């Protein structure tokens, strides 16, 4: 709650516009995470602590597990892969050039949810802020992030099997109206 008392003559009798920068909610973050410095110390034991953070991974964790405004009545903490979110959160907190000679976190998330929407739509929006996709692996909701990684398997021309007709690839597709 904010209250202001100002003299109208200071603004020439015009209506004053006031804007506020709010930090948002206190959410659960890893116990070895310093949200002010955006650093992780030591090995994480899986425990969480309350703190403010605009790291998209921990905002997503909050939205998925909070019972009042999130999906916490349907999903418990055991149903969400916090270890995948931990790796994603570390990637989001890496410092990158800001274009002005300084650095900034790779990804931040400052959302204000003002209307009720379908859970999947909100989940997709949160995930798109950090270039990841939600995946149900049969036991938990986990996440796969699009980020640079080591080569898993190199494919070269020698890996392509050519049939007797000299064709290496056969392309097939469905009609556009059937998709």
Name each model feature, range by range.
Residues 121-124, 131-132, 169-175:
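Generic recognition of flexible, low-complexity loop/linker segments
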Residues 28-30, 35, 117, 121, ...:
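Residues in flexible loops and secondary-structure boundaries
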Residues 128-144, 149-154:
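Hydrophobic or amphipathic alpha-helical targeting/insertion segments
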């Amino acid at each position: 709650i904010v209250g202001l008392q100002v003299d109208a003559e200071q603004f020439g009798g015009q209506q004053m516009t006031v804007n506020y920068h709010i930090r948002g909610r206190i959410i659960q973050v890893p116990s070895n995470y310093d949200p002010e410095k955006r650093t992780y110390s030591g090995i994480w034991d899986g425990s969480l602590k309350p703190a403010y953070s605009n790291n998209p991974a921990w905002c997503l964790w909050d939205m998925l597990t909070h019972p009042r405004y999130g999906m916490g009545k349907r999903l418990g903490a055991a149903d969400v892969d916090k270890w995948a979110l931990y790796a994603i959160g570390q990637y989001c907190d890496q410092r990158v050039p800001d274009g002005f000679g300084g650095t900034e976190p790779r990804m931040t998330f400052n959302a204000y949810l003002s209307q009720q929407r379908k859970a999947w739509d909100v989940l997709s929006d949160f995930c798109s802020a950090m270039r990841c996709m939600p995946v149900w692996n049969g036991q938990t909701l986990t996440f796969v992030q699009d980020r640079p990684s080591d080569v898993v398997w190199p494919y070269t021309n020698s890996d392509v099997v050519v049939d007797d007709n000299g064709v290496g690839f056969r392309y097939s597709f469905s009609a556009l109206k059937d998709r």
